[in-house]
Amino acid sequence: MVAAIPQGAAISNTDSKNPPPRDRQDKPQLTANNGGLQRRPRAAKNVPSRYLSPSPSHSTTTTTTTATSTSTSSSSSVILRSSKRYPSPLLSRTTNSASNLVYTPSSLPKRSQSVDRRRPSAVSDTRTEMSAATKMLITSTRSLSVSFQGEAFSFPISKKKETATPVSHRKCTPERRRATPVRDQRENSKPVDQQLWPGASRRGSSESVVPNSLSRSVDSDSDDGRKLGSGFVGRSMLQHSQSSRVSGDGRLNLGFVGGDGMLEMRDENKARQSTHPRLASSVSCDFTASDTDSVSSGSTNGAHECGSGEVSKTRSLPRNGMASTKFWQETNSRLRRMQDPGSPQCSSPSSRISSISSKFSQSKRFSSDSPLTSSPRGMTSPIRGATRPASPSKLWATATSAPARTSSSPSRVRNGVSEQMNAYNRTLPSILCFSADIRRGKIGEDRVMDAHLLRLLYNRDLQWRFANARADSTLMVQRLSAEKILWNAWVSISELRHSVTLKRIKLLLMRQKLKLASILKEQMCYLEEWSLLDRNHSNSLSGATEALKASTLRLPVSGKAVVDIQDLKHAVSSAVDVMHAMVSSIFSLTSKVEEMNSVMAEMVNITGKEEVLLEQCQGFLTRVAAMQVTDCSMKTHIIQLSRL
């Protein structure tokens, strides 16, 4: 990984432990040049700082870089922006803007100043910054493994000077991911009060800067780990460092470190590694995050968030290494300053505690409606929509119940010192309990992974259920269509069978009628003759009957009847004659009747044979019907096979 050191690292180191103090009533003056606000360098005054290490370390710079380091590295989280914003000048205009700088005290506007702290007022020369930034590059790294995390982190072990080409274009901000959930933040940053460092209660004064009253700033320091989650803030910071490494006037747009602060942090690296190796490894574990998953800008609380599931596999890019190395160095420098009680930034306990409480009370509101964004001029304030969180000066004024633009004495804020300190100590995570927080964070990460796997399995189950339901519905539709087709085929076959049966019955009736007609056609002549014979026979029978009646009924059988024998003889003889005549006619008719009888016997025999033949025909018809049904079924089966 490669880390770019600003111009303050190239300036010779001098001993500035006890310089004369600044006058707090002096106000920084600004001048507009080349479309941007330039701060006027003040007179050569050195500022004593209780945060500077008393040990012999390279931590001082010249007068021109003192104000720059105060404005950038003292806060590392508050980005000062003027009320009127201008785009940063191009690299091609750097020489012109540097040569045209005119610092006139009378032409600069006055700015409001905070009570307890002094604003930075000087900006170093552009050409000096560019030369220093191109001379100092850390090029070699070594990958280690954290025991409780298992992730690799970068640890600078050597230095090598190389030339770096300033980037004139800026990349687009990559897609931001969601911040760490509140549950993971509570697990990863559980406070342990008995392990707090002595300087932990004074962190607010070393991490806050009162900006211009007309501007707004964003606190991206240690409280950002609670406000937005380490992953979100780190991603925003790293995206900004990748998009704007060097601006047109030679200054680093990130605004985290600069001047003597960067030199001090770079030189205090090795001492901090030996003093707090665990903390150094804890802070470094987040600096191997990818360009979309990095920690916040060098904060110790941001290092506590490295177990929250936001650190992913790293891609060692030069710009990523540049930002992470600066975060690590700045964190070591600020941790060392917290133990030093000689800095003027901690001179006012009331302002320090009020700044801490104001930042801490703003964290919950800031976590829900202020995602951090990056702009061409650096980190801008949160959401530029309906609601924008106030700058630290306004938060300080809210916490102390005093106006933001007026100067209040320290006595006004001493009333709530104990309550604010207790609240801060209850919610401030300990640095020494980092491994436990990492374990809890890994537990939360495992839960998140389990929930993610459960969601994936549930989605897969839903997909399979949907596929099975769709297949079942398709099969059901096919089954219904097949059943409908079979039903229609059965109906058509039944209708066809009924029609065939009716046609067969009609055919049988026609055949019987034809047979009867053929038989009766031969007997019609005999029947016509029989009618004539029957008429004559009936006439003769009627005459014989009348003669017998007349002869028998009129005979006096009793009652002493007297008959003439001659007359009786004649009557009987006449009757016999009639009988003989009738016998002759009867004989002639008998022959005809016998012939008719023989014909009728033959007819009976023929009808018997016909009945037998009809029974055989009926059996044949039943067999033909069964065979026809089989034939129809075979035909329908052949038709279905041909369609498929």
Swiss-Prot record:
Motif QWRF motif, residue range(s) on this chain: 463-466
Principal cellular location given in the protein's record: other
Annotated region (Disordered), positions in chain: 1-129, 162-252, 290-414
Tissues and organs where the protein is expressed, per its UniProt entry: Expressed in young developing tissues, such as seedlings, roots, flowers, buds and young siliques, and to a lesser extent in mature green tissues.
Short name of one Pfam family: QWRF
Keyword flag Protein biosynthesis: no
Effect of loss of the gene: Embryo lethality.
Inducers of expression: Up-regulated by norflurazon.
Compartments it resides in: Peroxisome
InterPro entries attached to this UniProt entry: QWRF
Polar residues compositional bias, start-end: 91-112, 290-302, 314-332
Swiss-Prot/TrEMBL keywords: Peroxisome
Record's compositionally biased regions (Low complexity): 53-77, 343-370, 397-412
Gene Ontology cellular-component terms listed: microtubule; peroxisome
Listed Basic and acidic residues bias regions: 172-190
GO biological process: chloroplast organization
Superkingdom per UniProt: Eukaryota
Function: Probable microtubule-associated peroxisomal protein required for chloroplast biogenesis and for the formation of the prolamellar body and prothylakoids in etioplasts. Not involved in peroxisomal metabolism, including mobilization of storage compounds during germination, fatty acid beta-oxydation or photorespiration.
UniProt similarity note: Belongs to the QWRF family.
The protein's name: Protein SNOWY COTYLEDON 3
Primary gene name: SCO3
